[in-house]
């Protein structure tokens, strides 16, 4: 049986605010003591750059850094060389959008929905202004659900990118990403998934879904701020222009 009191004791924020009922984890999760300890331990015991030093403390961090990449690869079922560290999912989505910029041209269409987080909207607005891409919207129902029929209606030969949240951050609607990937790829379009809300709560297998890119944040799944993940198919990461 789930021991709620025991779990609450793992979180100093709750211990220090005993009357708190926290319902804002979709925005950011609370941090357990073990995560706080790990961050403090880095600054107190083994501070160094990664892959820049040839001494004991640096070697500790190299192993932690690379080991975490392996754990992320296991979590989402991909190769470790397909895992890129970012600051958060917003940074991941910006890196993807601007990394694809050389592959897009004026008149190309990006499909999103009206239910997207600003992180999955503003980069496309920027590219619309810079290079003249078109932004079109997939129709959803009143609960922000995409149906396969409405997605098929939205797709056309001019669509080069489809970018949607697997789970919406407001209503929690779960989109049929696997089926959408198959349809998008049949048109030659890239499929980008905002996994900020799905990866913390669902099994996400990027190979099974066949997504081209996926982003998510550590801070929404009991991790620290300033850590995000960008997954991309290796051949696509190799083909993209680095964004500095």
Feature roles, as predicted:
Residues 1-244:
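Pyridoxal 5′-phosphate
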